[in-house]
Structure formats: C-alpha cells, structure tokens
C-alpha cells in the first residue's frame, strides 16, 4: 500500500480533481450443510472528489452483524446502512497529512452458519480525465494514477450509435495495464491506469484494446488505449512539409534507439492498410524469433493472434471489426489486399475517416508529409557495426529532424515479421524462413493509394555498403501488409 506521508506531496497531489477507485471483491462462506453467506459490492469502481461523501451499494444474503474490518489511513469512518444496503465513505480532504493514497476498505459479517464472510474494496486517491468529447478509435493517456472515461455508446467517429451492454479487454500489454474497466451509468467506458512499477512519478506504459459487446456477446467496436509518458502537445512533434507530425510511431513507448529496450519500445504497433485495429510488435528488438510480443486478457491469461486468408467472408470491414485479433492475409484473388471485393479507397484518406487509427485531432500521414526527407546520420567512412543494431535513421528535411524506426513489416501472406533490406519492386519480396528477420528497413503506411495497392514511405540500411543506405520515398505495397503509422495533426 502506497502512502502519502509528506504534507507537501499531499498539497500538490490534491490540486486536481480526486477520485476514489474501488475494485469489488466478494468472499463467500459455506457450511457443511449447504448454508452460506454472500457479500459483495455492486460496483467495481466509485469515484470521489476530495472530501466528497458518496455511498456504494452492496448485496448480502444470509449475512448478519456487519462491521467495518479495515479502511485506509485518514479516510473517513465508513457507515453501513443495513436497510438500504449501502456503505457511505468519505475521501480525505485536501492536504490531509498522513493520508494513505490507496488501501482496502473491508466489511465483514457472519453467515447464518456462524462463519465469517467479507467483501473488500480497493480505494485509491486519483484524478479523472473525461475524453467523451474527443471521439476516436484510439486514446492517448499519459497521466499516472488516473481514471479515464470515453464514450462507449458511439463508434470512433462519434456519431454511429452502439448498443453497448458490456466492455471487455480484448488484449493488453503488459498484463494489468488497464484496471477497473466498467461501463458507467452514462454509457462511458471507465478505466484506471496506475504508476510505473519502477518510477511512481510516471504512468504505467503499454497498449490495450477495449471491446464493446451487445447483450448477445457480439463485438460491436473496439478502441485502442495508448498509455505512454508522451504528450504531443508539449514539444512532442516535428514539422515536415507543412505537416505537424508526432515524433514517434503510433503506439510507441519511446522514441530512441540508444539501447535494445529503447529500440523495441520505439517500434509501436502495426496496421493493415485501412484497418483501425492494431497488431502488437515483435517480441524482441532484433526480430530474432519472428514472433509477436505476448498479449494478455483481463484475467492475465495469454491471448493469441490468428491468421485467416482473405475471402468473401473474411475480407470485409465488418469481419475485420469483429475479429481484431485476426490478421487477414492477402491472396492472389484479392490482389493481396486484406479486403476481398472492391479495394476501398475511403478507409483511410487525407481527411480523417471513421477507420482512422490515430487519436482525436490526429490522422494517418499522407505521403506528402514525408517528401524530401534524407538521412541525417553520417554514412561515409563508418562501419556497418555502428548502425547494425540501431534499427532506425534520424531523418531530416534540412531544418527539422526525427528518428524513424526500421521496424520492418508484418508480411501480407501470413502476418509474420519481416525486416530485411530487399528491393520492394523486385519479385523477391517473399523470402523463405531462413531469410526472415534480418536488419533492417523502415516502412510506414501513408494514406496515398494507387489501384489495389497503397503507398508506403520507405528507407533502408545497407549493411554491406553503409554509404548506399538511403530513403526511397513512397513505394507501392500490398494492403494486407502490416506496417507502422505516423500521425499528423488534423487541424
């Protein structure tokens, strides 16, 4: 349990709106003759402003003599009302010295069999950020110990209504990134993101996908949550060709290639052209085993990706939306697009679309945003060893510069990672297993299209002749490929 014992810390902490985050946990006591007592809280989360008093309902069956067993330090004494079946609790007032930032509130009673039964609520002092007025398919969150809200009754365009009955974490990395996910009374998704395990002053970083389901269990929509210690509105952008561009990939947790961990965290997520659903990056920075990073569900169990070939059934926008864990592989009959029929040119465009994967106020970059970029790193007279493990170039337009990662792609045929320098116009795009995962090329989807293919920004590292490494600009690629994305401001 983390405590605030310094008055100055408390003073700064309480300047913002405060919340009480409560996770409900019920415990059942049973006797040999089958009699049992049950006790549980109604909600998984309850939010308070500083000093505010609220009540939370509980349910009790065959339970008597309820008492408070524990509460966090300096929280108001909870009051149990057995008639209304509520517990009233007060969050600490601002600047309360010695108040615990988090802890456990527990009520205990006796079942009719005489055995103890209890229910516990984890409580935490936090602030809230309501993003309901910023509809998008992804939400960038960057504050630690914070409860976030977004509209879960409308799709990412903010207008298409959804009959959302419940929410569920489809995948997350790391495990337990998203806590206390609920659908509140106003139809908002409510979730909590805590602090970094090694640095309490920073947000716990990672990515997650939250799904909205109807009463029959059908997946209606999904939203990407990008938790990162990054604020594009606070010197987190670079200006190229009149476009204000994020200085890192969508879903990236860093923008550095100083270490292998930095490289891996800077790759970000991968997208099939026109899809809003992200795919996780590789498990290792050097693509050594060609496999994905491990994903988890809300129970901490491992979640697996699948691959389906495009067909009349699978190659549709609806199927893609309903199967966010499925990489839809291109086939010859679909011209290696994940879409089977018409090659939709409206999924992504220069104007932000309903399928755009970028956060509110941002959109997928067009090819024009990358025009004229060249490698800023010195290439003459240097050894390949100097760049072999860097997996990225610093690119410049002559005035501004930004690091772009050589993150390769998920290849269109099977979704496997491929990161190798090879002329993208040649017939040698498809390599055998032994040729996979060699350093390294950079590929970024743009919104530009040509017939059944789309344009990707492309650069490479030539490990045999470093001086021949270069940016080749936009190159057409099959749309079933999975590639990183850079977002530009949609002002």
Spans of model-derived segments:
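Surface-exposed binding patches on compact interaction domains or structured appendages
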Residues: 38-41, 59-88, 127-197
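GGW-centered surface loops in extracellular recognition modules
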Residues: 130-161, 212, 217-267
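C-terminal, surface-exposed recognition/capping segments
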Residues: 252, 329-491
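Bacterial N-terminal signal peptides that target proteins for export
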Residues: 3-18
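Short, surface-exposed loop/turn segments at beta-strand-coil junctions that are enriched for proline
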Residues: 92-98, 196-202
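A short beta-strand micro-motif common to beta-rich folds, especially ectodomain repeats
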Residues: 99-113, 204-215
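Bacterial Sec-dependent N-terminal signal peptides
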Residues: 2, 20-47, 114-126, 487
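Short aromatic-cysteine micro-motif
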Residues: 180, 188, 206-208, 232-377, ...
């Amino acid at each position: 349990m983390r405590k605030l014992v310094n008055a100055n810390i408390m003073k700064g902490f309480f300047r913002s709106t405060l919340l009480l985050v409560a996770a409900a946990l019920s415990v059942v006591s049973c006797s040999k003759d089958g009699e049992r007592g049950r006790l549980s809280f109604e909600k998984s989360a309850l939010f308070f402003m500083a000093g505010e008093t609220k009540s939370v309902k509980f349910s009790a069956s065959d339970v008597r003599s309820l008492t408070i067993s524990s509460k966090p330090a300096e929280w108001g004494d909870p009051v149990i009302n057995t008639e209304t079946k509520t517990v009233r609790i007060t969050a600490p007032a601002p600047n309360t010295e010695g108040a615990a930032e988090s802890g456990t509130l527990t009520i205990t009673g006796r079942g009719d069999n005489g055995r103890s039964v209890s229910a516990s609520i984890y409580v935490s002092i936090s602030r809230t950020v309501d993003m309901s007025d910023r509809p998008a398919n992804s939400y960038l969150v960057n504050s630690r110990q914070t409860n976030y809200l977004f509209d879960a009754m409308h799709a990412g365009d903010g207008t298409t209504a959804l009959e959302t009955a419940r929410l569920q974490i489809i995948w997350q990395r790391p495990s337990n990134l998203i806590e206390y996910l609920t659908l509140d009374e106003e139809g908002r998704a409510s979730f909590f993101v805590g602090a970094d395990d090694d640095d309490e002053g920073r947000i716990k970083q990672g990515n997650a996908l939250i799904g909205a389901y109807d009463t029959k269990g059908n997946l209606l929509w999904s939203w990407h949550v990008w938790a990162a210690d990054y604020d594009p509105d606070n010197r987190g952008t670079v200006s190229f060709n009149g476009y204000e561009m994020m200085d890192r990939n969508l879903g990236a947790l860093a923008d550095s290639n100083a270490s292998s961990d930095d490289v891996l965290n800077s790759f970000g997520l991968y997208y099939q052209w026109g899809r809003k659903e992200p795919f996780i990056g590789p498990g290792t920075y050097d693509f050594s085993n060609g496999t994905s990073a491990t994903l988890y569900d809300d129970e901490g169990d491992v979640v697996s990706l699948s691959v389906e070939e495009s067909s009349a059934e699978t190659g549709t926008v609806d199927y893609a939306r309903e199967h966010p864990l499925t990489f839809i592989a291109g086939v010859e009959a679909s011209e290696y697009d994940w879409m089977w029929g018409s090659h939709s040119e409206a999924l992504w465009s220069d104007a932000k679309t309903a399928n755009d994967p970028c956060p509110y106020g941002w959109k997928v970059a067009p090819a024009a945003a990358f025009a004229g970029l060249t490698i800023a790193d010195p290439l003459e007279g240097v050894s390949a060893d100097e760049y072999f493990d860097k997996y990225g170039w610093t690119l410049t337009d002559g005035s501004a510069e930004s690091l772009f990662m050589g993150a390769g792609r998920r290849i269109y045929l099977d979704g496997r990672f491929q990161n190798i320098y090879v002329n993208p116009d040649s017939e040698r795009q498809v390599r055998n297993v032994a040729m996979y995962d060699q350093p390294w090329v950079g590929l970024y989807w743009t919104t530009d299209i040509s017939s059944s293919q789309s344009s990707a920004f492309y650069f490479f590292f030539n490990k045999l002749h470093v001086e021949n490494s270069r940016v080749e600009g936009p190159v057409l690629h099959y749309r079933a490929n999975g590639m990183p994305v850079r977002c530009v401001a949609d002002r």
